[in-house]
Regions:
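Intrinsic low-complexity, intrinsically disordered or marginally ordered coil/linker segments
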Residues: 1-203
């Protein structure tokens, strides 16, 4: 089993139809999503919901057709190895599994954009590749801000529209974690200090 990285992300999408589609994905409404996608000319770039469940990461950074890719490469005169799902996800998303969003809220803005506030865990590390994919479309009206913590491996960080800064958690006295992240993750430092006090008492 992996260590879990806790994530809070704020994602802005530029148009209401994208927000409606993303809400369907987050609510696991596959049929509504596919019906909605069919009503939009050429799907307007929305990913196809295949045999595997479509989630937050796949919505913004769709996975390849692993089976189809294998068949296509099998007919190639040059030997290739099509990536397995694990390798592709780790190399592209930055984490090995799709995420289950524990909670989200959505705000529809006056300019037609929508902002999502999401809370989810990811395996071992934050999905920085997906954040980069969202930021790559910033000229289309997308934006991404996220913070994360992986207490087991002792790091936390902040992603702000293309810039990722990661820090060793350390202790309150030694860490270089910015004050606003120390405050956000004060529960982690409280827990570590309580453990240190217990160890000191128990020898």
């Amino acid at each position: 089993m992996p260590n879990w990285c806790e994530n809070q992300a704020t994602i802005q999408v530029p148009e209401r139809f994208i927000a409606e589609a993303l809400s369907c994905v987050l609510d696991d409404n596959r049929q509504v999503y596919e019906d909605y996608r069919k009503d939009i000319p050429e799907g307007r770039g929305l990913p196809f919901w295949g045999e595997q469940p479509l989630g937050l990461l796949g919505f913004f950074f769709p996975e390849p057709d692993y089976d189809g890719g294998d068949k296509e490469l099998a007919n190639d005169s040059v030997h290739h190895t099509f990536p397995d799902w694990y390798s592709w996800r780790v190399n592209n998303w930055g984490t090995k599994w799709e995420v289950d969003v524990e909670h989200y809220t959505r705000e529809d803005n006056d300019d037609g954009s929508s902002t999502f506030f999401l809370y989810f865990d990811s395996a071992w590390s934050p999905p920085l590749g997906v954040y980069d994919a969202i930021h790559a479309k910033s000229n289309q009206g997308y934006s991404i801000y996220a913070i994360y913590i992986e207490g087991g491996m002792g790091f936390c960080g902040e992603y702000d529209n293309g810039s990722d800064n990661s820090y060793e958690l350390g202790s309150r006295d030694t860490t270089d974690v910015p004050a606003h992240l120390q405050e956000e993750y004060s529960w982690h430092y409280d827990y570590m200090e309580e453990n240190e006090e217990e160890e000191a008492v128990n020898g």
